[in-house]
Design a protein with these regions (language model features):
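Alpha-helical transmembrane segments and their helix-membrane boundary motifs
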Residues: 1-58
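Regulatory sensory and allosteric helical modules in signal-transduction proteins
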Residues: 106-162
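Juxtadomain coupling helices with adjacent low-complexity linkers
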Residues: 172-222
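Short hydrophobic/glycine-rich mini-motifs in sensory/regulatory modules
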Residues: 164-173
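Short, hydrophobic-rich beta-strand element in sensory/regulatory alpha-beta domains
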Residues: 89-93, 97-114
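Membrane-proximal helical linkers
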Residues: 52-83
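Short amphipathic alpha-helical segments
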Residues: 80-84, 88, 122, 185-189, ...
Length: 222
C-alpha cells in the first residue's frame, strides 16, 4: 500500500506540473515549492516501501515434501534414549520449520522421522566437512548448491538443509520446508540438542546399535 501511494503521488505530481498553465509566463513560486515538496514526499514514500519490503520480506511458501510421513528407530536403543529422541524430534518437527530428519551415529542411522524416502544414508563430503570442522552447515537454498545430490536420502524437493555434527561420530541432518526457513534461534536449539545427545550416544555399548531400524510398533513386535 505504501508503494502504491508513493507511485500515485509521484504520478499526480508529474501530471499536475505538466497540465498547469499559468496566466503569466512566470511560474508562481508557491506552485514550484508545492511541486518540489510533493515530489520529494512521493519519492520518500517509495524509498520507505522498498526498505520495508527488504526488512520484512514475505514468508516463503511451504513446500509439500515428496515422501511418506513416518518414524523409524533402532529397536535395541535404551528406553531412556528412545524417550529423548522421541521428545526432541517431536519438538523439532513442530516448533521449527523442520519437516524431515535423520540421526546418524558411527555410520548407523538411529532415527528417521518426518517425511521419509527409501534411499539409504551415505556420508557425503558436506557431512564429512561438518564433522571435521565441528561446525553447523546450513544450506539455505538447496537449488543453489551443486552438491545437493549428496542428500538423496532426503525428499528430492527439500528446499533447505541443516547439517549438525554430534562430535566426530554423529550427525543430525535436518530438512526444512522452505528456502531460508531456519532462523538463528532454530540453529541454536539444534546445536544444544546435539550436545545433549552426544553425552548419551558416547556411552552406548556397541550392542545397542545392532537392532533393526523400524517403526516403533514393528520394533516392539520383533
Amino acid at each position: 500500500m505504501v508503494l502504491i501511494g508513493g507511485l500515485a503521488g509521484l504520478v499526480l505530481t508529474v501530471i499536475n506540473a505538466a497540465t498547469f498553465h499559468p496566466v503569466t509566463a512566470a511560474v508562481p513560486p508557491a506552485f514550484e515549492r508545492a511541486s518540489v515538496l510533493s515530489g520529494a514526499m512521493a519519492v520518500a514514500l517509495l524509498l520507505v516501501s522498498i526498505l520495508w519490503t527488504q526488512a520484512n520480506p514475505r514468508d516463503p511458501e511451504k513446500v509439500q515434501l515428496e515422501g511418506i510421513q513416518g518414524l523409524q528407530l533402532v529397536a535395541s536403543l535404551p528406553n531412556s534414549l528412545k524417550q529423548e529422541l522421541g521428545w526432541g524430534s517431536t519438538l523439532l518437527l513442530t516448533a521449527t520449520p523442520a519437516s524431515t530428519m535423520l540421526l546418524v551415529w558411527g555410520q548407523r542411522v538411529l532415527l528417521k522421522r518426518g517425511v521419509l524416502v527409501s534411499e539409504d544414508y551415505c556420508n557425503g563430503p558436506i557431512v564429512q566437512r561438518a564433522k571435521e570442522k565441528q561446525q553447523t552447515i546450513s544450506l539455505v537454498n538447496m537449488a543453489l548448491y551443486p552438491g545437493r545430490d549428496e542428500f538423496n536420502y532426503l525428499p528430492s524437493n527439500t528446499p533447505a538443509v541443516v547439517v549438525q555434527p554430534i562430535g566426530e561420530e554423529g550427525v543430525l541432518v535436518i530438512g526444512g520446508w522452505s528456502p531460508r526457513c531456519f532462523s538463528r534461534s532454530d540453529e541454536v536449539w539444534i546445536e544444544g540438542w546435539a550436545r545433549k545427545l552426544r553425552t548419551e550416544l558416547e556411552l552406548l555399548p556397541e550392542v545397542a546399535l545392532q537392532g533393526p531400524l523400524a517403526p516403533p510398533e514393528s520394533a516392539a513386535e520383533s
